[in-house]
Amino acid sequence: MIFASNNQGKLKNIRDIFHEYDIKSLKEANIFVEVEEDQDSFYGNALKKATEIYKLANEPVIADDSGICIRALNGEPGVKTARFLGENTTPRQRNQEILNRLKDIQDRYVEFICNLVYYDGKNILVGEGILKGNISKEYRGENGFGFDEI
C-alpha cells in the first residue's frame, strides 16, 4: 500500500497507525509526481491524490488532505493551509503568520481537519477527523510538525 504524501511527519504517523501493513512512501514506490491540490474540500483533494497515484502504481493507496480552519479568520486558511503563503514557505513561517493575524484577537478557536481516503481501484473508504482547540499566543513545545507548536 502506498501513502500518497512526501511529508515525512505524516508518513511516520500513518505507519504508526497502520503498523500491521507495509506502507510505502511515494519515493519507495518510485513515484515522483506531485498531485495538484486544486479541489475545494479536504475530501476532494484526498480523493484526487488517491485516484491519481493509483493510476500510476496500480496498487492500493491511502491519501490525505488536512488543514486548519480558524473561526476568527472566516475558516481560513482551510483547504489552502499548506499553500496560503505560497508554495515555498516553511511551517514555521505559516505558524508565525497565523500568530501575527491573531495577535489582537481573543477568539482563537480552530479546527484541525484531516480526511483520509483509501482507494484500491474499486473501493473508496473515507475517514474524517476533527480536532478542536485554540491557537496559542506563542510557540509551545518542540515536538511534532506542522501546527503542533501553536
Residue ranges with predicted function:
Residues M1-I2, Q8-I150:
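Anionic-ligand binding patches
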